[in-house]
Design a protein with these regions (language model features):
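Long, charge-rich, low-complexity intrinsically disordered regions
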Residues: 25-33, 52, 65-77
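Short alpha-helical "recognition helix" segments of helix-turn-helix
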Residues: 40-43, 129-134
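Short capping segments at the starts of secondary-structure elements
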Residues: 21-25, 31-41, 120-126
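Short amphipathic alpha-helical interaction segments
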Residues: 46-59, 134-147
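A short, conserved structural fragment
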Residues: 59-69, 146-160
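N-terminal leader segment of winged-helix/HTH proteins
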Residues: 1-15, 59-64, 69-84
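Short alpha-helical segments that sit at the start of domains
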Residues: 2-26, 90-115, 140, 162-163
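Conserved segment of winged-helix/HTH DNA-binding domains
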Residues: 70-104
Length: 164
């Protein structure tokens, strides 16, 4: 059953702004809305960009997964978990300023800071150490991690996404 995704954390705007920003992402999401689909099927239809889109949807929990037997092998299938968004946020100007400083950052600028943080954290680093090292507010750091396909939070640490 499809549900509405409640967004009440202003930093979620960071990932939401990137969820449907390309035609491929929109088409992949349309596909997972209609049916359960494997990563292989997405990659066959949309190439590497489709694969990245589906991984982003999984990271942001826009899709649910299940394991199914196909051709004698267990295959992970994906399906859209939400059919709508309910956005309800209230925020101070300072917080909104920090959120939009990351959300509106050009992709090439974002990739540079993302790569520097990725190199800095190694096996994982406390978020406050990363914030201190890169002169970022906690809100900016949270937005960077939510926008990124390379970083994720594990408790108080920032780690490399998909490597733990």
């Amino acid at each position: 059953m499809m549900q509405a995704k409640l967004i009440n954390d202003i930093t979620d705007i960071a990932w939401l702004s990137k969820a449907f920003d390309t035609d491929v992402k929109r088409r992949v999401f349309d596909d997972v809305t209609k049916e359960w689909i494997t990563m292989e099927e997405v990659k066959k239809r949309y190439g590497n960009e489709g694969e990245k889109a589906l991984k982003f949807f999984e990271k942001t929990r826009l899709v649910e997964t299940r394991w199914m037997m196909k051709e004698g092998k267990a295959k992970k299938e994906y399906h859209a978990f939400y059919s709508s968004f309910h956005i309800n946020v209230m925020s101070s100007i300072d917080v909104i300023r920090d959120v939009f400083s990351i959300v509106l950052m050009r992709d090439n600028e974002f990739k540079k800071i993302e790569e520097k943080i990725y190199d800095f954290i190694g096996e994982g680093e406390l978020s406050r150490e990363v914030e201190r090292n890169f002169n970022l507010s906690p809100i900016q750091m949270k937005c960077i991690v939510k926008r990124s396909m390379k970083l994720e939070y594990k408790g108080m640490k920032i780690e490399r996404f998909g490597e733990s």
